[in-house]
């Protein structure tokens, strides 16, 4: 919603983080006030459909312009109650026109970084479900906080089993994810790549 932004982004990937918008109701430049209100409605709708996600606070101050007389400072204590979760049970990853190679415990190579693609993944015990994907190939990254890496891991699509075997811990996975993130807490010990045979 900043000046000059085309405002075509969507909030779908915000499922696992707290997100807040504070906007002056009279801040009409670049249609910021209307876009902020629209995002509020979109986030309300997403949270209604998925109550465990999309924690948000959208405040439109009707009589304020771009300067909100510091009313937007309320965002700081609200955001402070959230903590990063590197291993959410459910992920909604919607790529924008600027694409990325990784998101939480999912990763794609350069051939599968498709603008506007959406991946929804969830995990429960030793099973990971990815009901739909409009990419051909996806890497799932794992560690011992997520599941038991000494036991077989099942990865299912809507049409069948994509993987069912033990996923070994490797130094390569640890090194790659440490290099990417620069964060020891963000390392993953194992990874497996699955392919959708029927993907476009």
Per-region residue spans from a language model:
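Structural recognition of the beta-strand scaffold that forms the well-ordered cores
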Residues: 13, 18-23, 56-60
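Conserved alpha/beta-hydrolase "acid-adjacent" motif
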Residues: 28-38
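Surface cap/lid and interfacial helix-loop subdomains adjacent to catalytic sites
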Residues: 6, 23-27, 86
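Conserved strand-to-loop "acid loop" that flanks and positions the catalytic carboxylate
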Residues: 20-30, 62-63, 132-134
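Alpha/beta-hydrolase-fold serine-hydrolase catalytic core, especially in secreted/extracellular enzymes
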Residues: 40-200
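Mobile cap/lid helix-loop segments that gate and shape the active-site cleft of serine hydrolases
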Residues: 1-12, 16-17, 31-33, 48-49, ...
């Amino acid at each position: 919603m900043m000046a000059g932004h085309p405002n075509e982004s969507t909030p779908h990937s915000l499922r696992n983080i707290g997100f807040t918008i504070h906007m002056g109701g009279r801040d009409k430049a670049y249609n910021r006030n209307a876009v902020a209100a629209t995002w509020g409605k979109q986030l309300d709708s997403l949270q209604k459909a998925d109550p465990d996600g999309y924690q948000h606070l959208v405040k439109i101050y009707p009589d304020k312009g771009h300067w909100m007389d510091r009313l937007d400072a309320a965002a700081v204590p609200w955001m402070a109650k959230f903590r990063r979760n590197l291993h959410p049970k459910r992920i909604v990853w919607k790529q924008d026109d600027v694409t990325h190679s990784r998101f939480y415990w999912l990763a794609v190579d350069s051939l599968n970084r498709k603008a506007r693609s959406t991946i929804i993944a969830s995990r429960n015990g030793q099973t990971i479900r990815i009901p739909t994907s409009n990419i051909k190939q996806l890497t799932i990254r794992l560690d011992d906080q997520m599941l038991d890496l000494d036991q077989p891991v099942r990865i299912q699509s809507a049409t069948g089993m994509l993987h069912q075997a033990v996923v070994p811990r490797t130094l390569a996975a640890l090194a790659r994810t440490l290099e990417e993130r620069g964060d020891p807490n963000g390392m993953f010990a194992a990874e497996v790549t699955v392919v959708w045979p029927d993907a476009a």
